Amino acid sequence: MAEPQPPSGGLTDEAALSCCSDADPSTKDFLLQQTMLRVKDPKKSLDFYTRVLGMTLIQKCDFPIMKFSLYFLAYEDKNDIPKEKDEKIAWALSRKATLELTHNWGTEDDETQSYHNGNSDPRGFGHIGIAVPDVYSACKRFEELGVKFVKKPDDGKMKGLAFIQDPDGYWIEILNPNKMATLM
């Protein structure tokens, strides 16, 4: 007999839990440290993520032989960033949920260069999410800054959350964690 499915056709809560294992004790100090997005123009991306979303550049790494740079951003106080190079790198790579922007040198000057955001065929990567105290206030500010919206807070069936796009077209969900229970 087939297992009952929720209305969505996805896994039931029980089925989802049955697919999961308890964490091995050896993984107790693991953490999700970063997600990486390739960017065409680091100047535009750094401006967007710092000025528009309020993130802090916590580490920059250049790889001249391979012709690329990494920019790590997080919601951290810039005064907490260590000054000494090795300590700064270790500190940056021990933060939770950082955003790594990878820039392959020269893409900013190539008019044919673009990256797939995963939200059109073939679908894949979807979005990152930013928690904010007030979605409507944040979106009002984004509108004033000329940010491109995929979905405004009152559009569609899921009210109270929004999706914006960064300079490369990646989607960013804007949500209030305390309000999400009414949507899920």
Curated annotation (Swiss-Prot):
Its EC number is 4.4.1.5. The modification Phosphothreonine is found at T107. Substrate binds at Q34, R38, N104, R123, H127, K157, M158. The keyword Cell inner membrane does not apply. The modification N6-acetyllysine is found at K148. Its cofactor is Zn(2+). Changing T107A: Loss of phosphorylation. The active site is at E173. Binds 1 zinc ion per subunit. In the homodimer, two zinc ions are bound between subunits. Regulated by oxidation of Cys-139 in response to the redox state of the cell. Results in the alternative formation of cystine or glutathione-bound cysteine, the latter modification leading to reduced enzyme activity. Catalyzes the conversion of hemimercaptal, formed from methylglyoxal and glutathione, to S-lactoylglutathione. Involved in the regulation of TNF-induced transcriptional activity of NF-kappa-B. Required for normal osteoclastogenesis. NCBIfam families: glyox_I (TIGR00068). This is Lactoylglutathione lyase. The lineage of its organism: Eukaryota, Metazoa, Chordata, Craniata, Vertebrata.
